[in-house]
Amino acid sequence: MQICLMDETGATDGALSVLAARWGLEHDEDNPMALVLTPQHLELRKRDEPKLGGIFVDFVGGAMAHRRKFGGGRGEAVAKAVGIKGDYLPDVVDATAGLGRDAFVLASVGCRVRMLERNPVVAALLDDGLTRGYADADIGPWLQQRLQLIHASSLTALTDITPRPQVVYLDPMFPHRQKSALVKKEMRVFQSLVGPDLDADGLLEPARQLATKRVVVKRPDYAPPLADVATPNAIVTKGHRFDIYAGTPLTE
């Protein structure tokens, strides 16, 4: 994949070349998207809209730390949707990891989560965030146990992941109507990079075959159900729906 690669660390250790080789990235000087190694983190920028700033994954500070400390925890809609109850903390595959926010919420309340991400740039951002998270004295010990990244296409990976998870979580990219600054900024940068998930409808059936308990699909409230498969089971929040489908139980 081609993208503009930039190193702002001032170091001469070749870290950017190593990163490019690992994720299969080729430097393209004229690409409007840039992956930038800063002294603090790896970030994605839209070069023709510099005011949008950089997007990076941060599990340790910022909004994620606030959500972990002061958010609803088990009361969050995503936690309810995957079925967390009492001692039951399902094993989850997040097949559309993105920036890892929902996966992190589930991990922070005790679930083991395997994140799938097919876009190499997004996977590199996630990996960078995980590396910093794993090294953090506060969250590192449990984050290493509960949150993992698999760089693979969900369409193929969903058929051969073992062991099978109890829950598969899907949050395909869907054009956002909201005008909130954060969503607008992130979506503009993100959609410039990856575009909409045109093949997302193809994820529902393999997800249902893989999950032993349920599949949860996050949708904007105005979006049709994934693959036009309606379900009476949903958790509705302001602006979103978590549609719930039955999985395929383990056979003895």
Swiss-Prot record:
Principal location listed in the UniProt entry: cytoplasm
Gene3D superfamilies from the UniProt entry: Vaccinia Virus protein VP39, YhiQ-like domain
Pfam family membership, one: SAM_MT
InterPro entries assigned: 16SrRNA_methylTrfase_J, SAM-dependent_MTases_sf
Lineage top rank: taxon: Bacteria
Keywords recorded for this protein, A-Z: Cytoplasm, Methyltransferase, rRNA processing, S-adenosyl-L-methionine, Transferase
Binding site for S-adenosyl-L-methionine: 101-102, 117-118, 153-154, 171
Substrates-to-products reaction catalysed: guanosine(1516) in 16S rRNA + S-adenosyl-L-methionine = N(2)-methylguanosine(1516) in 16S rRNA + S-adenosyl-L-homocysteine + H(+)
GO molecular function, one term: rRNA (guanine-N2-)-methyltransferase activity
Coiled coil (residue ranges): none
EC number, UniProt record: 2.1.1.242
Gene Ontology cellular-component terms listed: cytoplasm
Keyword NAD set for record: no
Location relative to the cell: Cytoplasm
HAMAP family the UniProt entry points to: 16SrRNA_methyltr_J
Task of the protein: Specifically methylates the guanosine in position 1516 of 16S rRNA.
Family: Belongs to the methyltransferase superfamily. RsmJ family.
Name listed for the protein in its UniProt record: Ribosomal RNA small subunit methyltransferase J
Organism: Salmonella schwarzengrund (strain CVM19633)
Gene from which the chain derives: rsmJ
